Design a protein with these regions (language model features):
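Low-complexity repeat regions of mature extracellularly deployed or surface/particle-associated proteins
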Residues: 1-219
């Protein structure tokens, strides 16, 4: 789906296996030749996928893309979901239920909210935040490996990250604040059986970190 304009509502539903859903809001052309000529302000983009081995991605392009709401819901195994949003005051959410699923959100803009929720066995969540005053939420619950990666860079001041990994299986969290991303806040909770591993690095100033690891396994 390729569309443009202010106040747009897009809803897609896909059922089956080995399918691809692509949503472009505000993109003037697929070859990017008209990227800066259209807007997608105040848009609501909702994608629902049921099945296995599917790919779903939603994307806006830089310029005139504020106040958007992106929601992707996936039920099934071996699925890959991506949201690529730009500009300010946007909210993006990916919810995945099933096994061996991957989710990735990236955004460049201020005052944004990024959320990934994963329930099942073996999953990976990745969020890139390239703006200020934004909130990152990742919740992973179930069995198998829990893997999460959060990057704040560059000029990502006053960003907060709340990361929860619960259940049986190994838990691995990587959270980074690079130069130009001051005043960061992290709360990380890892709970349940399996190894608890956290790799946290701040290449910046003024940050608060809270890490809680509960369970009978290595931490």
């Amino acid at each position: 789906i390729q569309t443009k304009g202010t106040g747009t509502t897009i809803t897609t539903k896909q059922a089956g296996s080995s399918n691809v859903t692509g949503i472009y809001c505000g993109l003037g052309s697929f070859d990017n030749s008209l990227v800066n000529t259209h807007n997608c302000d105040n848009a609501t983009i909702t994608a629902t996928v049921t099945g296995n081995s599917n790919i779903v991605y939603s994307q806006s392009v830089w310029s005139n893309h504020g106040d958007q709401t992106w929601i992707t819901t996936v039920n099934g195994n071996d699925n890959y979901a991506v949201i690529d949003m730009d500009e300010d005051d946007n909210t993006s959410t990916i919810i995945q239920t099933g096994d061996d699923n991957d989710a990735w959100i990236l955004g460049s803009g201020d005052d944004n909210v990024y959320k990934i929720e994963q329930l099942g066995d073996d999953y990976y969540a990745k969020i890139y935040a390239f703006g200020d005053d934004s909130d990152v939420w990742i919740t992973q619950e179930g069995t198998g490996d829990h893997n999460a990666y959060v990057l704040n860079y560059p000029n990502a001041d006053n960003n907060s990250t709340r990361l929860i990994q619960k259940g049986s299986g190994n838990k691995d969290a990587d959270v980074f604040w690079y130069s130009g991303s001051d005043d960061g806040d992290l709360t990380l909770t890892q709970q349940g059986n399996g190894a608890h591993t956290s790799n946290i690095k701040f290449y910046t100033d003024d940050y608060d970190v809270t890490v809680v690891q509960k369970g009978s396994s290595n931490k």
